[in-house]
Amino acid sequence: MKHTLQVIITEKELDIRVRELGQEITKKYRNSRNKMILIALLRGSFIFISDLCRRIHIEHEIDFMTTSSYGRGMLSSGDVKIIKDLDEDIYNKNVLIVEDIIDSGKTLSKVLDILKLRNPKSLSICTLLDKPECREVNINVDFIGFSILENFFIVGYGIDYAQSYRYLPNIGKVVFKK
């Protein structure tokens, strides 16, 4: 489908906000005696977590999880499958899930349920982009980079459209041509 891209968050704005998030996370966890682990939900969060982890100034581990809930279509089936599970044990650790974007919240809700069964000390969420108007599941998000109040397709900074545009240094809105 023919489309154009409109920049909605610049590279500079991303850099400033990721620094701020790193400071907020550092402040929250700096006095904890428990180990901290960041869990990136792949693939969309890979650029965000690589920048964010360097802005968190306390010792932490990093791990990755890949899930799927789409089957063959474009709409989520709600049935979350773990494609790549964690390599590290999260028992008694402060877990911070790092997400690129939260829309309906269905997949993230299932991931939370799965991780809670592994008995972390704490379980928090950091998302680069939050679309609260699209939420279908009640999820408490601890750290939000930017709220997107309109419902449109977003690309860049790790987020793709048909596996394209992940490389963009900014966040863009996909504008479909009629």
Swiss-Prot record:
Diphosphate binds at residues 43-44, 166. IMP binds at residues 99, 103-108, 131. It comes from the Bacteria. Mg(2+) binds at residues 99-100. Keywords: Cytoplasm, Glycosyltransferase, Magnesium, Metal-binding, Nucleotide-binding, Purine salvage, Transferase. Pfam families: Pribosyltran. It is found in: Cytoplasm. This is Hypoxanthine phosphoribosyltransferase. It comes from Buchnera aphidicola subsp. Acyrthosiphon pisum (strain APS).
